[in-house]
Amino acid sequence: MRVTKNKIDCLNPNTGRRISIDSAVYELFSKAIYDILKKEKKGITYTEIVNGIKKHFSDQKITFKGSIGWYAVTVKHDMVANHIIETWMENGTRLHKLKK
């Protein structure tokens, strides 16, 4: 993750490409993803992460007008690239959890 003025470059570990997003949006999503994964010990799917973000935003009374799914995958990929999240396949399903 590279930070420039009010932007963060998010790295996709699959392609090696970077995409810049607003740093406040990055913080919002990374905190939500971290909080969701902190509660899960076994690992959860991407769909469960997105649903958890929506619930987190609702609980916190956060209104977000952009695509939650797009930002969720972008920030999640950056967190994987920075070794905050680990992913693995189990019975044909990709699971995610915080790296120990």
Go through the PLM ranges and name each one.
Residues 54-72:
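Short, positively charged loop/turn segments that connect secondary-structure elements
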Residues 80-90:
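A short, conserved structural fragment
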Residues 1-35:
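Long, low-complexity, charged/polar intrinsically disordered regions in eukaryotic proteins
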Residues 90-100:
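Short, cationic-aromatic polyanion-contact patches
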Residues 38-42, 56-59:
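Short helix-capping/hinge SLiMs at alpha-helix to coil transitions
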Residues 48-53:
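A short acidic, leucine-rich amphipathic alpha-helix
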Residues 74, 78:
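Alpha-helical DNA-recognition elements
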